[in-house]
Amino acid sequence: MKWLACCLLGVGLPMMTLAAVEPGKDPVPSVMWAFYHKQLLGDAPFVFDERVRLLAPPFAEDARQVPLEIDARAFAGDVVRVLAWAELNPLPRIVDFRPEARVLPWLSIRIRIEQATPLRAAVQTRDGLWHVGSTLIDAAGGGCTAPSVVRTQPGWEEHLGEVLGARYPRGDTSRLRVQVAHPMDNGLVSGIPEFFLNQAQLLDADGQVLARLELFPAVSENPNLGFDVQGPGQTRLMLRDNSGNQFEAAIP
């Protein structure tokens, strides 16, 4: 019985340790943090962590196309999942990013901002703890409710799902940059229902998954994505939208 009690105690220790973690002070105090902590992280243990870096302009000159970099390379090899959201957006969720062994926990993406808002990226490590990076961005507003520019271009449907991409060697890694032709309609413009890319996978030449992404309507139209991939070899990007359309592109 003593042996069983010790085993049970050992199993409970990690959870007890995580529960005792002091999260620290919110670097961008927000009345919405408690809501999103419960809604997106399930009230799981977390720390505000400067090692999770969010790089965004201090002011969104074009609220429909705001560049954002999420850098969790300080936790390379230990990252399970990366969630990002804009707290005061009407549609806050941005991306659920799950890098595998050869993809570093770094992602670039363009997003829509409706108003000045805290941006968050929560990085879950293998011990179950969430490391939360934060920044503030100011904006004139309207990025989420502005009509699509893509839909004003004649024949845009003929180019739906086309992918432009390139690989840029950087020592032992390569940076992949891709742009996908898609209106990314978020349902907030009158008369235009939701129509957006919601799933993506990055694969190597053998079909092994390098990264999985779930995308949300806060992502800008004609999405831009960037990844850091270790090692050589061709990669393929597989995409699917919420209407069931599937797209594929090879990146040499």
Identify the residue ranges that each predicted region occupies:
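Bacterial N-terminal signal peptides
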Residues: A5-P14
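N-terminal edge beta-strand
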Residues: Y36-A63, Q153-P169
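Surface-exposed, short loops/turns at beta-strand junctions within beta-sandwich domains
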Residues: R110-A116, D228-G233
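Short beta-strand edge segments in extracellular beta-sheet folds
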Residues: L136-G142, P252
